[in-house]
């Protein structure tokens, strides 16, 4: 069984916004920590402070995400805000990885990401997916996807996108735990015995 929660905050203080997101996750999922939390946050926040407050409040086992340009859930949307998707599941096994130095060596960054994948070591989970978030301003997004596909022998379906910064085009970040990192790519690996669908929609 899989339980999910999509949460949103328009609070402007980084620590307060992080606590607000974490509190909403706890209200939705109960006392047990989420297996994974995916965070999208405006560049107006101090991301390290925001992420630390989220972690201290709802204690996700894995947290990834990126800076963004407009944040939303199914009920709310805005700019200069933050949102997150949390889930806990008995049907999906998750892990996370990061590749740094995308600009200098995107192939190495891809190898570092794939080194964290558990699905290449087991046949227990026939369906393998990964959410990929990359620093858009570091470039090489297309080559990263190609390299990830080759390194996984085409056995994974990938979804994701590039980090934003409220359309300033100055500096973008991906999130790995409580770190906000530029010039990097992060992945959330999702392993399951049943297929996962990927839906496409924007705006």
Regions found by a protein language model. Give the residues of each.
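Cofactor- and metal-binding active-site motifs of prokaryotic enzymes
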Residues: 1-203
